[in-house]
């Protein structure tokens, strides 16, 4: 993982966010969230999933357009996993929430959960009073063994447009461990 935390000059998401937030702030966010750079597709973004104990669980590789900041989805969706690229045959992927490693450092902050890793980075800049986590997708990491790290935390759910109904089904699971669960408006 540590070797990937460099070469940001060829990381399309870093390039885009530097134009929006400034290079210094983008560097801070990439370091805070341990976002890396992969050689895949000539330079892409690695979102490391690191658990509360600091153990790397997975690395999701995604390609972004450096001008628009959008994911590249044509002619195909450019998403892969580090363990796939390294051909780790017996790798047992056990995902966690993106940004989970930040929970231990901010034990009293409320938690806000979004779908996309990029959204967690951007929201962390604009609304730093929360620990911003990402599920990695509409269904993402909403499992009993994953949400246990949110025990006794106040949680705000911020689903993408059209995903509120799907996330509504997860409230009961979250309510069993969190002190409070609400949806953003």
Which residue stretches match the model-derived regions?
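Secondary-structure boundary/capping positions in well-ordered alpha/beta enzyme cores
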Residues: 24, 130, 153-154, 178-181
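Short, well-ordered coil/turn elements that cap or connect secondary structure elements
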Residues: 2-5, 127, 150-152, 175-178
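A generic structural motif
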Residues: 134-138, 180-185
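Acidic beta-strand-to-loop metal/phosphate-binding motif
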Residues: 113, 150-164
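TOPRIM metal-binding catalytic domain and adjacent DNA-binding surface shared by DnaG-type primases
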Residues: 1-57, 103-105, 177
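Phosphate-handling DNA/RNA-contact segment within nucleic-acid enzymes
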Residues: 40, 46-151
């Amino acid at each position: 993982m540590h070797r990937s935390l460099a070469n940001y000059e060829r990381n399309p998401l870093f390039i885009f966010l530097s134009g929006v937030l400034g290079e210094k702030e983008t560097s801070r966010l990439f370091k805070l969230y341990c976002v890396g750079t992969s050689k895949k597709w000539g330079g892409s973004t690695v979102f490391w999933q690191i658990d509360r104990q600091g153990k790397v669980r997975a690395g999701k590789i995604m390609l972004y357009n450096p001008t628009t900041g959008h994911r590249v989805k044509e002619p195909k969706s450019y998403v892969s996993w580090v363990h796939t690229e390294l051909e780790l045959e017996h790798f047992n992927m056990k995902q966690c929430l993106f940004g989970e490693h930040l929970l231990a450092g901010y034990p009293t902050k409320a938690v806000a959960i979004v779908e996309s890793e990029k959204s967690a980075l951007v929201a962390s800049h604009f609304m730093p009073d929360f620990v911003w986590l990402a599920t990695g997708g509409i269904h993402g990491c909403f499992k009993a063994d994953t949400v246990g790290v949110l025990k006794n935390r106040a949680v705000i759910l911020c689903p993408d447009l059209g995903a509120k109904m799907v996330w509504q089904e997860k409230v009961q699971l979250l309510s069993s461990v969190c002190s409070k669960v609400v949806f953003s408006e």
